[in-house]
């Protein structure tokens, strides 16, 4: 079933407009579906999710959702989104009454999304979150530098985990990491920020903007998190598990556990944001 944008709460519509487009994953950057892991072949073709920008097979990317043009991921080799894909919906836009924000009167487009993004859109619609959101596999703090090693955490202990993307800004103080010359300097900065500021972010407004953000990934057989416990369900992580990595603190939880946690109204990570609840 396609996501019906006419039921998006006003706050979510505004957040979708404010969310920057995800980076487009090039065809040669993935030989398999980012969801089921099936290899791409002549018969199993590549399909891009227009919200997270990642590559999927047809079975994992056959839903559609209406999104603002500003948040649609596009092929960098294409100059523009085809005009015949634009949708002007007066009934949908009629609920946006903020005259001070011209971006509310924006073109919306019906695009293909993956199963994970469709699920996240459904959850966000139900929660009516007042904070910026991100896609299930990407966020506006990542770049297309592949096979980088970044610092992550399971529970309270920092671990090293290979991820396809690297932060371009510190998830704690939001300082640009491009100012650091080496990867080790970036890792050291993030580790220090997590150690010194995990309980007192730069300001609460900025914290709330980032507290719920996460990316979804599947654990491999070599993941350093294997055997450690998800502190929500107390079950050990196993190869093949779908997990959520929190942007702010880099903690990792089972994806379903974290989504269930968010549905209670929690502001974010159970470890670092357990005392914050939505009003």
UniProtKB/Swiss-Prot annotation:
Q: Where in the cell is it found?
A: Cytoplasm; Nucleus; Endosome membrane; Vacuole membrane
Sites where the protein binds Zn(2+) 2? 49, 52, 114, 117
Keywords noted in UniProt: Cytoplasm, Endosome, Membrane, Metal-binding, Nucleus, Phosphoprotein, Transferase, Ubl conjugation pathway, Vacuole, Zinc, Zinc-finger
Q: What class of enzyme is it?
A: transferase
Q: From which residue to which do the FYVE-type zinc fingers run?
A: 27-122
Q: Write out the residues that bind Zn(2+) 1.
A: 33, 36, 57, 60
Question: A GO molecular function for this record?
Answer: ubiquitin protein ligase activity
Pathway involvement of the protein, from the record: Protein modification; protein ubiquitination
What GO cellular component is one of the record's annotations?
endosome membrane
Which biological process terms from the Gene Ontology are attached to this UniProt entry? cytoplasm protein quality control by the ubiquitin-proteasome system; protein ubiquitination
Q: What does this protein do?
A: Functions as an E3 ubiquitin-protein ligase. Binds phospholipid vesicles containing phosphatidylinositol 3-phosphate.
Q: What is this protein called?
A: Putative E3 ubiquitin-protein ligase C36B7.05c
Which species is this UniProt entry from? Schizosaccharomyces pombe (strain 972 / ATCC 24843)
